[in-house]
Amino acid sequence: GLNPLKRHSAGIACYYTGPKPALHKWPVKEFFGSYVAPRRIEGIPQGNHYDLSVNHNPVVNNTNGSVVGYKYFNFDYTYGKNNLQLLINVVPAGIDATIDVWVNSPYVSRGGVKIGSMSLNSSMKQVKTELKTGVTALKEMRGKKALFFVMKSSTAERSLCEIHDFVFVGK
């Protein structure tokens, strides 16, 4: 599994849903939830192709009810660590909202465990901002687990933020 102690681009998401299905109106698709935005780099990038300055795609259109998921992180790396936090770089969209952080599943009925939550508010500047949440429950978790971000807001059909990258930190 992926090392949660290394920063990862949000664009590696393998699971993203919205509150309702996308509409396919050729040649355009209309999305009602999260998706990975395409980015292009002019020329051939030099150096490490996995460097976030080269290889970066944000997850956008994160509306109320959207879920963004990642498989799999190896939480043996965080086992036993103190003061564990999740740091996530977002661009707020100017509305009040919450991003809940889950492991295993985004649903309790399917074995999901909520490990943290972050708030966005309408007064936040719409520039790249680092949000933090304590994720102390990871201190006791081991093995490969899926990670999910669940978007919540009372404002329907408006993106809460763009998600750029994230990393877990601890001592």
Q: Which role does the model predict for each range below?
A:
Residues 1-171:
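Extracytoplasmic
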